[in-house]
Amino acid sequence: GSDAINRLAEPIPARDLPTLIDWMVSNKVDLCVAGEESYLVKDEGLANACARVGIPCWGPVKESAQLEASKEFAKDFLLRHRIPTGQARVAATLEEAQEFIGGVYPTVLKFDGLAAGKGVAVCMCREEADAFLKEVFTDRRFGEGRLLVEEFLTGPEVSIFGALVDDHYLILCPARDYK
């Protein structure tokens, strides 16, 4: 978030999910707006924990948050529901990733896990791919995990957001991330 939030609210330490939930209950929080996505998927899941104590949460339950947390899960979901997506293979090792790339550039490499927005690399050449593969498999920059080697697609990338309550949904405005 923005530093300006300090003028509106007091930052609290959120060391772990149980501590955060206890704080929300003791301070009679009546709505939780999930920001940091890792809280949605680790442990019980923020939205799940909020539901357990009766606090509405603007954010997906742990099971649905896997769409953001796991590139492999998201890819399987897209394929299962016939949503157009690039072809991809999942590599568990550096050697396997190099084999799947097969000298074809550009290629897209995606770490299968949360990586604070840094887990995707569009590689135009072997040197760029090798550098990212080193970060993933040798340096373990993002922790343990697998990697998607994905077909490079051209055109604008658009994110579609929606809100779901029970069996009702609302599609929000599309958004683009200009990185």
Which residues fall in each region the model found?
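Short beta-strand-to-turn element immediately C-terminal to the catalytic PLP-Schiff-base lysine
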Residues: 91, 120-125, 162-165, 172-173
